Amino acid sequence: GFEVDFDRVLTQMARRAPGKDKTATPRKEKDLPKVLSGMLGNKLTGAPLCAVIENTNTKSGDYGNLLDCPRPGHSDYTAFVKYNASNDIRGGGHFSGRLTAPIVFAGAVCRQILESKGVKIAAHISSIGNVSDSSFCPTEIDDALIEKLNSSSFALIDETAEKPMRDAVEDARMAQDSIGGTIECCVTGIDAGYGEPMFEGVEGVIAKAVFGVPAIKGIEFGKGFEL
């Protein structure tokens, strides 16, 4: 019976959608989810929530050369070995970064449910290359900052970091290279006591989900790497 604000869901989908500027993939997709089940009149019904996000800008022929020349750092070669050369190379198959679209859809719905219980989530670009943004205050994060970050297409606490970050991405692009970065995420309004011992702890469950996003190579909680 929870009522979903679908416009807010679409706002989050638009933030993820590619093709908006040079810091993202040039492929253009609207990322419009079509709900098949689990929602009636914007209210969750209790049935499994299922939506389809169609690919509209497809050029399958562009991937033909990857059968003989796999992309460095991508799944092409490992998928070739794992599936005995039967893998679908078009668009990366089920290893494609496009699969972050359904993650964003599910997250946008879950975020609204959590907010109704007083739990708020936000994230920002912490660094790109050697350019860094300011960090969250470890003791107090106000709602205005959370709202600002959640509506931004290039989420930063210190907006003066945007230009040097974009310049770093552009320099890497012109050099036909890539560049790494980090994201800092905060959760407010949650009580202690969630999770289970050992393998089902909150950090372990979150880490498993985060590593489902392509290109993630590390995660820390609090000041984990600095201690």
Give each language-model segment a name.
Residues 1-227:
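Generic N-terminal targeting/processing segments that precede catalytic cores or assembly contacts
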